[in-house]
Amino acid sequence: MKKKSGLSFLWLSAVAFVIDLLTKYLVTQNFELYESVNILPVFNLTYARNTGAAFSFLAEHGGWQKYFFIALALIISAVLVYLLRKNSARQKLQNSAYALIIGGALANMADRAYHGFVVDFFDFYWREWHYPVFNVADIAICVGVGLLILDSFKNGEKKANEQ
């Protein structure tokens, strides 16, 4: 009997992908560019466009970065799908991490390919200082990376206990 692989976690990628694109659609249909609605004393919904990567990295570099980030998202996603295929379904933390990163990377890639930029809208701030605006895909990627870090500590502990 063939054992189940980590590919069974790709549903999580699909959920992250759909939620991200749906929230971006809602923002673009209901907000003008840079329009901001205060939700909490430290949080706004603000429609912003990002042609770069996280924190607008490479945003002002003439357009080549669009293709670079599309290629990067495809390569990273392909590698992570390969790793999911090799993993056992029992590796829940690692598989969840890979799936979240794939969903977030592909959602931002789709946005970038369609619009030429990524739609961001979560705007946290304190007084005059604003954290860079981000989206659901960014959250999925960061949570995925956090789960990988947690998994590495758990596996490191497990290996240390086995010795």
From Swiss-Prot:
GO terms for cellular component: plasma membrane. Keywords: Aspartyl protease, Cell inner membrane, Cell membrane, Hydrolase, Membrane, Protease, Transmembrane, Transmembrane helix. Its main location: membrane. It is found in: Cell inner membrane. Pathway: Protein modification; lipoprotein biosynthesis (signal peptide cleavage). The chain crosses the membrane at residues 7-27, 64-84, 99-119, 133-153. It is a multi-pass membrane protein. Belongs to the peptidase A8 family. Its EC number is 3.4.23.36. GO terms for molecular function: aspartic-type endopeptidase activity. GO terms for biological process: proteolysis. This protein specifically catalyzes the removal of signal peptides from prolipoproteins. Pfam families: Peptidase_A8. It catalyses: Release of signal peptides from bacterial membrane prolipoproteins. Hydrolyzes -Xaa-Yaa-Zaa-|-(S,diacylglyceryl)Cys-, in which Xaa is hydrophobic (preferably Leu), and Yaa (Ala or Ser) and Zaa (Gly or Ala) have small, neutral side chains. This is Lipoprotein signal peptidase. The active site is at D120, D138.
